[in-house]
């Protein structure tokens, strides 16, 4: 579950029209949220408050072996933050839970009447206790397509790190330059979205896919340690059910690691994901499986959810990546005129020839819209997550939900191993696998 400040940062990106999914760092977000979700390993309580429309603060305490805590402050000059950020009682569980991502990167950044809202800033500071650790972050939108982020960590033992991110997003391409004082690490990320060519006979449903290719290169100047990887992502919808699905393929040429994932929403309340890893050098492989199940409440649509649905419905088509391939509105279309009987006959023949295809297009479009609306209108109150791996031989469970105005997250991880083999040498005939919990934790959040 997202922390309150992470949730506020997501809403800041939404307010300034910054696309979270159009980034190489988040190209594997769908499978990562289902397979590699974090499991809490301690008790943590977080109390947050939206004191003014532009300031937010959080106080949290957590205990594992010793008592710790922190205080966090955030300020932003972005507009409509008081409407985007909700308290824990009225917030939608989907907004604070990392789940399947519906990839719709922007096609282009077009000037809008609210263009000044893109050039905004966010200031973040965190102080921990009893250890005097400090964290700071600055996000500055330079223009509609460029953003600068600075992150700083300072600890009492003199371990200080400053990291800078320069990002340029045109919708079709995303460039990102990273520099850090930790070993003088330098990196470059790039993501390219392939767009289909618009056609008179093909609409977004025949070209209903998102194909993205990206890569990253890293170099530690102090240690001269290189790193690189490349990933291909393909997103589409089922034409018969409207359910989305995502496939990815990742390759690391330095370590010879190949990874492929497949994630699909089997229904409006369930998602399944699989991942296969293979190493060309060691010939080792691993198969991972994960799923999540959402539970609906008695009230299917709250006013806050209905407001979000209306907001998505009123979004202009020119802000979506594939707006140029969407079917035109029949109310705004201009019918061609036939000046002769031969032309009228030709138009009638074309209408008869393509009537079945046009009906199929409308049916597929309706199926996708109905599936998305069914998810948006649902009032989910809890979600179960489960993942396992054949190599690690573990089982990870996580429950997240809402109760009496609180946001709760509880999880555990079970490992299947023989602890005696780690201490004493035991003959293979006496090996017996044990199933025991490796970690367990509970997190509570409350915000006003």
Swiss-Prot record:
- What does the record give as the function of this protein? Component of the ERMES/MDM complex, which serves as a molecular tether to connect the endoplasmic reticulum and mitochondria. Components of this complex are involved in the control of mitochondrial shape and protein biogenesis and may function in phospholipid exchange. MDM10 is involved in the late assembly steps of the general translocase of the mitochondrial outer membrane (TOM complex). Functions in the TOM40-specific route of the assembly of outer membrane beta-barrel proteins, including the association of TOM40 with the receptor TOM22 and small TOM proteins.
Q: HAMAP family recorded for this chain?
A: Mdm10 (MF_03102)
Q: Which organism is it from?
A: Zygosaccharomyces rouxii (strain ATCC 2623 / CBS 732 / NBRC 1130 / NCYC 568 / NRRL Y-229)
- Write one Pfam family the protein is assigned to: MDM10
- Localized where? Mitochondrion outer membrane
Could you state one GO cellular component term attached to this entry?
SAM complex
| Keywords of this entry | Membrane, Mitochondrion, Mitochondrion outer membrane, Transmembrane, Transmembrane beta strand
Q: Which family does it belong to?
A: Belongs to the MDM10 family.
**Keyword check for Zinc:** no
Domain characteristics, as noted in the entry: Lacks alpha-helical transmembrane segments, suggesting that it resides in the membrane via beta-sheet conformations similar to those predicted for other outer membrane proteins and porin.
Put simply, this protein is called Mitochondrial distribution and morphology protein 10
- GO biological process annotations for this chain's record? establishment of mitochondrion localization; mitochondrial genome maintenance; mitochondrial outer membrane translocase complex assembly; mitochondrion-endoplasmic reticulum membrane tethering; phospholipid transport; protein insertion into mitochondrial outer membrane
Q: How does it assemble?
A: Component of the ER-mitochondria encounter structure (ERMES) or MDM complex, composed of MMM1, MDM10, MDM12 and MDM34. Associates with the mitochondrial outer membrane sorting assembly machinery SAM(core) complex.
Q: What is its main location?
A: mitochondrion
**InterPro entries per the UniProt record, alphabetical:** Mdm10
Q: How does it sit in the membrane?
A: Multi-pass membrane protein
Say yes or no: keyword Transmembrane present.
yes
